[in-house]
């Protein structure tokens, strides 16, 4: 993703004549090689964009500047609004990026074709090897950093299915194992792509349905486009069936909110849920060589989401997204209604507990033999805490209880006035129980 990257601007100029030479002294002879660009040095954390990604379920992203045949380095950071970049950044230089596309910052004429881009990349590798062997008497900043970054994850934004094969072939020639980003049409060359054994990054930007209500416009729709529109949701299923290792990305989507919708559609079309989960968690973590994200285990970052149901079902919604231990509420959960009258037991002592008020703003009253106790209640479904003030008005002491709501009761642990820890429970009184108590009270009154 290009999230949070402050893009450098091209210098203004009105020259219409072709530019053949580099504009940068001390760098590689071709300005479309931007190996010296470091994403971490050009950051502009965008809270609005971060919120959109969190709502889709993301907590950690790999950001880079997708500009140039060598686009520089990317960083790994979290979508954590509450802290600074110093805390958000997990790795400031995690990857080196390549594409077949020219840089928008340069007007240099070469390369002007896909074939030219491939030739330039090959020339770069040869020049880098020559430079590393001490072949140059002068310093070349681009070749210097390109060689330094060879130990990083090498990500090639290839795009089209055929370009995946082209990128892999370049990698084979120079002994580079690229992680290759595709375009979502990999199923059309699945046999060749499978043989590459490359790890892919796959977008799920399914094409919109064509409007064929106008007969004239309908005739302009190409059959191959219609066929791809029909087959696109099967792409992830086909990749999984052929044991292609891949992660998923929001790249190429007009709106990040379409990510979950399209992913659920892919699952509906046969993409296994366990494969989908791995493509969102463990596989991206392995691509980034990070062992403290992607799984929930002791020592890992507290990054996880809370969902109302199965994440891959359309009726489910993301309710919370926790990032580096910070809670982000996506959809406010309506707390369950625990109002009513309870029989409260603390250790072996019985009390009457009444929970009243509005849902989300409850109040509690506790009494014993008609003696009322000062009570403060906090309820954060399913957790409940109660502070009960002692009957002694001179030497005030407290009983502190906390616990969970279950289907049948409220229960947990209590700290008594003397510091002793005991169990407690509160069982909701039925209407029948209340009636019986009233009858007993009436008889006593008679």
Specify the residue positions occupied by each region the protein language model found.
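C-terminal cap of metal-dependent C-N hydrolases
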Residues: 301-334
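Polyanionic/metal-chelating signatures
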Residues: 45-187, 291, 311, 317, ...
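N-terminal pre-domain segments of enzymes
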Residues: 17-21, 422-446
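Tryptophan-anchored aromatic micro-motifs
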Residues: 333-352, 361-370, 375-377, 410-417, ...
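Glycine-enriched alpha-helix->loop->beta-strand junction motifs that scaffold or abut catalytic
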Residues: 171-177, 194-201, 243-245
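Metal-associated gating/positioning segment near the N- to mid-region
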Residues: 1-56, 61-64
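His/Asp/Glu-enriched, well-ordered alpha-helical/loop segment
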Residues: 7-9, 16-25, 36, 153, ...
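Contiguous, well-ordered beta-strand patches that form the walls/edges
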Residues: 369-408
């Amino acid at each position: 993703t290009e999230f949070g990257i402050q893009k450098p601007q091209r210098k203004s100029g009105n020259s219409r004549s072709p530019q053949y030479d580099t504009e940068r002294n001390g760098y590689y002879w071709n300005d479309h090689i931007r190996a010296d660009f470091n994403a971490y040095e050009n950051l502009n954390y965008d809270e609005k964009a971060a919120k959109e990604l969190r709502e889709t379920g993301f907590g950690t992203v790999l950001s880079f500047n997708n500009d140039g045949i060598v686009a520089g380095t990317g960083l790994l950071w979290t979508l954590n609004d509450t802290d600074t970049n110093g805390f958000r950044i997990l790795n400031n230089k995690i990857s080196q990026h390549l594409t077949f596309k020219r840089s928008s910052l340069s007007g240099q004429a070469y390369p002007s074709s896909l074939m030219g881009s491939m030739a330039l990349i090959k020339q770069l590798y040869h020049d880098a090897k020559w430079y590393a062997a001490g072949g140059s008497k002068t310093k070349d900043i681009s070749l210097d950093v390109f060689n330094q970054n060879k130990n990083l994850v090498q990500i090639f934004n290839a795009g089209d299915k055929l370009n995946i094969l082209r990128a892999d072939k370049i990698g084979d020639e120079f002994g580079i194992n690229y992680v290759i980003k595709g375009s979502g049409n990999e199923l059309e060359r699945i046999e060749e792509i499978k043989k590459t054994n490359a790890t892919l990054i796959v977008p799920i930007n399914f094409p919109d349905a064509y409007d064929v209500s106008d007969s004239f416009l309908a005739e302009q729709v190409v059959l191959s486009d219609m066929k791809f529109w029909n087959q696109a949701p099967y792409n992830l299923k086909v990749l999984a069936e052929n044991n292609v290792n891949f992660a998923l990305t929001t790249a190429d989507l007009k709106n990040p909110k379409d990510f979950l919708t399209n992913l659920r559609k892919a699952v509906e079309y046969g993409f296994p849920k366990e494969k989908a989960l791995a493509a969102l968690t463990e596989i991206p973590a392995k691509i980034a060589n990070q062992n403290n994200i992607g799984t929930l285990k002791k020592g890992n970052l507290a990054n996880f989401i809370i969902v109302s149901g199965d994440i891959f079902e359309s009726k489910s919604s993301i309710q919370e997204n926790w990032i580096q231990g910070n809670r982000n509420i996506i959809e406010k959960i309506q707390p369950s209604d625990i109002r009513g009258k309870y029989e409260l037991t603390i250790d072996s002592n019985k009390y009457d507990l009444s929970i009243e008020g509005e849902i989300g703003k409850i109040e509690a009253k506790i009494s014993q033999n008609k003696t009322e106790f000062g009570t403060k209640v906090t309820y954060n479904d399913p957790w409940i805490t109660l502070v009960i003030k002692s009957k002694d008005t001179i030497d005030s002491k407290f009983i502190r209880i906390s616990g969970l709501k279950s289907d049948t009761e409220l229960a947990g642990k209590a700290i008594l006035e003397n510091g002793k820890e005991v169990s407690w429970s509160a069982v909701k009184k039925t209407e029948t129980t209340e009636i019986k108590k009233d009858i007993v009270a009436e008889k006593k009154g008679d």
